[in-house]
Design a protein with these regions (language model features):
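Hydrophobic anchor at the beta1->P-loop junction of P-loop NTPases
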Residues: 6
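Conserved lysine of the Walker
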Residues: 14
Length: 145
């Protein structure tokens, strides 16, 4: 595991898992939200992403569908946090300030995005693919590393 992509609903713990894996595996964690950072243009974001993808190793969390093909083609591991809506809402409750704008997205995530996420798994045939369905499974996975 040297190039890891983590996807899933808001509140599922993508960033938390990325940080934990980064510490355990001593790999750099690249947040797509961090690459976007404020008012970057699309071209600036794309340039930052290309530089990040060219690194020897990384962990990237975030969905950003427009960039998924580039990330999937270069990853060796894809982790899908396939949590139910209540687990994701619980994750949102940990954030300050509370992201009210994410509640509707979380509530409808599975219906709107599950098929897309399954397609990402299918596209990543070359990679190790993990589907973790609960925080307990995430903890158990981290304990195996």
């Amino acid at each position: 595991m040297k190039r890891i992509v983590i996807i899933g609903c808001s509140g599922s713990g993508k960033t938390t898992l990325a940080q934990a894996l980064g510490e355990k595996l001593e790999l750099p964690v690249i947040s797509l939200d961090g690459l976007w950072c404020g008012n970057a243009t699309k071209a600036e974001f794309d340039s930052r992403l290309e530089r990040a993808l060219s690194l020897e190793s990384w962990i990237m969390d975030g969905n950003y569908g427009r960039t998924m093909d580039a990330r999937l083609s270069r990853c060796d591991t894809l982790i899908y946090l396939d949590f139910g809506r209540f687990a994701c809402l619980q994750g949102l409750l940990q954030r300050r300030p509370f992201p009210w704008h994410r509640v509707k997205e979380v509530w409808h995530y599975r219906r709107k995005n599950h098929t897309r996420d399954e397609l990402y798994l299918a596209k990543a045939q070359h990679a190790q693919r993990l589907v973790l369905k609960s925080r307990k499974e995430v903890r158990e996975f981290l304990n195996t590393i």
